[in-house]
Amino acid sequence: MKITAIIPARYASTRFPGKALAEIIGKPMVQHVYERTAKAGLVSEVIVATDDERVAEAVRAFGGRVEMTSATHETGTDRLAEVAARIDADIIVNVQGDEPLIEPAMIDEAIAPLVADASIRMGTLKSRIKSLHDFLSPNVVKVVTDREGDALYFSRSPLPNFRDKWNDLKDEAFVTGRLLCYKHVGLYVYRRDFLLAFARMAPTPLELAEKLEQLRVLENGFRIRVVETSFESIGVDTPSDLDKVVEKLSRFQI
């Protein structure tokens, strides 16, 4: 079984232009993501997908594989699908290009269910929400699952919504930890044919309302297996996020 990890990496960014090439301890960010992804035990190969020659040159400079894509894609999924359509692979892993601290074990955790069960078409990760701030923040996507671990819904709103006894339930969740709430970790794994089919599906009402592409999958009646991970990463959306990553890498010499 061939498992290919694709890292979509754009140069343009509204909040942080050029972040894919931002230097972190002597290397561009995209190189950190590439090297850590390559350490995942289940990954056969790693490819950077970009529409910018500056990013492509940086990847070639450290010996990585790069595929050029159209500059007109509206989503990262579309960019991923363009590359997936022209390569030979059984499973495609979408690793965000702004996650320089991603743990290789996280990638393996997300891949494992698709290797073990041929009926699973798509997978992703979740981790425990540990603060009320994150639970209430629309920037933190929440997820609830069924007993098998398949997603029931993703939302920017609090999930679940505590109708009664809010203060008691809040303490259960965020003080005692007996009631678990989860946030979505944006790493996706697809069977190649399902990814290509997903990219052809029209946007759906809930997807457009929440601005969450994965809801398109649920609205079309497909399952997403969600695996809990204990690992934490830091997504780089702003220069201040980059400072946090640099500080952590410097301190622990990761």
UniProtKB/Swiss-Prot annotation:
<dbReference type="InterPro" id="IPR029044">
    <property type="entry name" value="Nucleotide-diphossugar_trans"/>
</dbReference>
<dbReference type="Pfam" id="PF02348">
    <property type="entry name" value="CTP_transf_3"/>
</dbReference>
<keyword id="KW-0448">Lipopolysaccharide biosynthesis</keyword>
<dbReference type="GO" id="GO:0009103">
    <property type="term" value="P:lipopolysaccharide biosynthetic process"/>
</dbReference>
<protein>
    <recommendedName>
        <fullName>3-deoxy-manno-octulosonate cytidylyltransferase</fullName>
        <ecNumber>2.7.7.38</ecNumber>
    </recommendedName>
</protein>
<dbReference type="GO" id="GO:0005829">
    <property type="term" value="C:cytosol"/>
</dbReference>
<dbReference type="InterPro" id="IPR004528">
    <property type="entry name" value="KdsB"/>
</dbReference>
<keyword id="KW-0548">Nucleotidyltransferase</keyword>
<comment type="similarity">
    <text>Belongs to the KdsB family.</text>
</comment>
<comment type="function">
    <text>Activates KDO (a required 8-carbon sugar) for incorporation into bacterial lipopolysaccharide in Gram-negative bacteria.</text>
</comment>
<keyword id="KW-0808">Transferase</keyword>
<dbReference type="GO" id="GO:0033468">
    <property type="term" value="P:CMP-keto-3-deoxy-D-manno-octulosonic acid biosynthetic process"/>
</dbReference>
<dbReference type="InterPro" id="IPR003329">
    <property type="entry name" value="Cytidylyl_trans"/>
</dbReference>
<keyword id="KW-0963">Cytoplasm</keyword>
<dbReference type="GO" id="GO:0008690">
    <property type="term" value="F:3-deoxy-manno-octulosonate cytidylyltransferase activity"/>
</dbReference>
<comment type="pathway">
    <text>Nucleotide-sugar biosynthesis; CMP-3-deoxy-D-manno-octulosonate biosynthesis; CMP-3-deoxy-D-manno-octulosonate from 3-deoxy-D-manno-octulosonate and CTP: step 1/1.</text>
</comment>
<comment type="pathway">
    <text>Bacterial outer membrane biogenesis; lipopolysaccharide biosynthesis.</text>
</comment>
